[in-house]
UniProtKB/Swiss-Prot annotation:
EC number, as in UniProt: 1.1.1.27
Role this protein plays: Catalyzes the conversion of lactate to pyruvate.
Activity regulation note: Allosterically activated by fructose 1,6-bisphosphate (FBP).
Known pathway: Fermentation; pyruvate fermentation to lactate; (S)-lactate from pyruvate: step 1/1
Positions carrying Phosphotyrosine: 225
Binding-site residues for beta-D-fructose 1,6-bisphosphate, renumbered to this chain: 158, 173
InterPro entries in the cross-refs: L-lactate/malate_DH, L-lactate_DH, L-lactate_DH_AS, Lactate/malate_DH_C, Lactate/malate_DH_N, Lactate_DH/Glyco_Ohase_4_C, NAD(P)-bd_dom_sf
GO MF entries: L-lactate dehydrogenase activity
Gene3D superfamilies attached to this UniProt entry: Lactate dehydrogenase/glycoside hydrolase, family 4, C-terminal (3.90.110.10), NAD(P)-binding Rossmann-like Domain (3.40.50.720)
Sequence similarity: Belongs to the LDH/MDH superfamily. LDH family.
One Pfam family of this chain: Ldh_1_N
Identification of the protein by name: L-lactate dehydrogenase
Binding residue positions for NAD(+): 19, 40, 45, 70, 84-85, 106, 123-125, 148
Length: 325
C-alpha cells in the first residue's frame, strides 16, 4: 500500500456534499493530513470549498487543499467516499441501495485505474453494503476497505449514557454493533462507565428503570431520522467520526474503533461487512475483536447480518454489476 509518511499525508475525498464538506472542515480544524483533494461532479463547489477551507489555515496548520480529479488518487494514502444520494425523510438507509451502488461504481473504477494503493474509507449509505461493494469493485484486500460502520452510533450511545450518569462521554465505553441502520443493536453486556459495568451501575441506582435503557438505545437507533426530519440531513457527527478514523490510519494508532469490517468466521459470519470493534492502523484493519456476546446479542448480530446479506445479494443480481473479485 501507499507509504504513509509523517511529513506528508494525503487524503482524497470523493463527495463534497454536507457530509464531505463537514469532514474536510474537521480535517482542517484538527490538522489531519497535509494534503486534501476534493472530488465532486459539481466542480465549482469543490473549488469554492477548497478556497473557503484554505482561508482557515492561518488559524490551524499548513495544508494543501484543492479541487481534485480521480487521477489525483494515485499517490493518496486514504480515499474517503461520502458521495451518494442523500437519505430523505421517511427513507431508510437500505432504500438507497440501488441508486448508490450505481454511483459507487462510477467512483471506484477510476480510482483503481489511477493506480491508488492506499485505504478506502466508505461513509455513503447504506454503508455496510457499499463497503462490501467497494471491496468487490476494487479487488483490494479486505483489510484495506473499511466502512464508518457503527462509529457514529457508538458515539451517540456513549453520549446518551454519559448524560444519564453525568460523566464525560469519553469515560463511557460502549458499542453499537451490526448494521449501521435499523437492525443495529446495543452491546449492554460489555458497556461500562470507568470500568463499572452498566448492569452494576443500575443495581446501585434503583431509580433508573430498564425502560430508560431501552429509550437510550431507541434514541440512538432513530437519531438519524430525528435529525433528518428536523434539518434535512446529518453531517457534523459523521464528519467528525470520519476524521477520527482517518487520524487512526495516518498516525498508525492501532486504535480500537467500531467499524464496518469484513467477517471471515468471526461471530459465525462470512463474506459480509458489518459493524464490530476492530484494530486499525496505517495498514488498515489488523484485527477484529470478537466480543463474547450474550445469546440475545448474538441473535441480533445474525439477524442484522442476514438482512444485509439478503439485500446485497439481490442488488448485485438485479444490477448485474461487474466486479474485480
Amino acid at each position: 500500500m501507499a507509504n504513509i509518511e509523517k511529513d506528508h499525508q494525503k487524503v482524497i475525498l470523493v463527495g463534497d456534499g454536507a457530509v464531505g464538506s463537514s469532514y474536510a472542515y474537521a480535517l482542517t480544524l484538527q490538522g489531519i493530513a497535509q494534503e486534501v483533494g476534493i472530488v465532486d461532479i459539481f466542480k465549482e463547489k469543490t473549488q469554492g470549498d477548497a478556497i473557503d477551507l484554505s482561508d482557515a489555515l492561518a488559524f490551524t496548520s499548513p495544508k494543501k487543499i484543492y479541487a481534485a480529479e480521480y487521477s489525483d488518487a494515485k499517490d493518496a494514502d486514504v480515499v474517503v467516499i461520502t458521495a451518494g444520494a442523500p437519505q430523505k425523510p421517511g427513507e431508510t438507509r437500505l432504500d438507497l441501495v440501488s441508486k448508490n451502488l450505481k454511483i459507487l461504481k462510477t467512483i471506484v473504477d477510476p480510482i483503481v485505474e489511477s493506480g491508488f494503493n492506499g485505504i478506502f474509507l466508505v461513509a455513503a449509505n447504506p454503508v455496510d453494503i457499499l463497503t462490501y461493494a467497494t471491496w468487490k469493485l476494487s479487488g483490494f484486500p479486505k483489510e484495506r476497505v473499511i466502512g464508518s460502520g457503527t462509529s457514529l452510533d457508538s458515539a451517540r450511545f456513549r453520549k446518551d449514557i454519559a448524560e444519564m450518569v453525568n460523566v464525560d462521554a469519553r469515560s463511557v465505553h460502549a458499542y453499537i454493533m451490526g448494521e449501521h441502520g435499523d437492525t443495529e443493536f446495543p452491546v449492554w453486556s460489555h458497556a461500562n462507565i470507568g470500568g463499572i459495568k452498566i448492569s452494576e451501575w443500575v443495581k446501585a441506582h434503583p431509580e433508573v428503570k430498564e425502560e430508560e435503557l431501552v429509550k437510550i438505545f431507541e434514541s440512538v437507533r432513530d437519531a438519524a431520522y430525528t435529525i433528518i426530519n428536523l434539518k434535512g440531513a446529518t453531517f457534523y457527527g459523521i464528519g467528525t467520526a470520519l476524521a477520527r478514523i482517518t487520524k487512526a490510519i495516518l498516525d498508525d494508532e492501532n486504535a480500537v474503533l467500531p467499524l464496518s469490517v469484513f467477517m471471515d468466521g468471526q461471530y459465525g459470519l462470512n463474506d459480509i461487512f458489518i459493524g464490530s470493534p476492530a484494530v486499525i492502523n496505517r495498514s488498515g484493519i489488523t484485527n477484529i475483536l470478537e466480543i463474547p456476546l450474550t445469546d440475545h446479542e448474538m441473535e441480533s448480530m445474525h439477524k442484522s447480518a442476514k438482512q444485509l446479506k439478503d439485500i446485497v445479494t439481490k442488488a448485485f443480481e438485479e444490477l448485474d454489476i461487474e466486479t474485480r473479485q
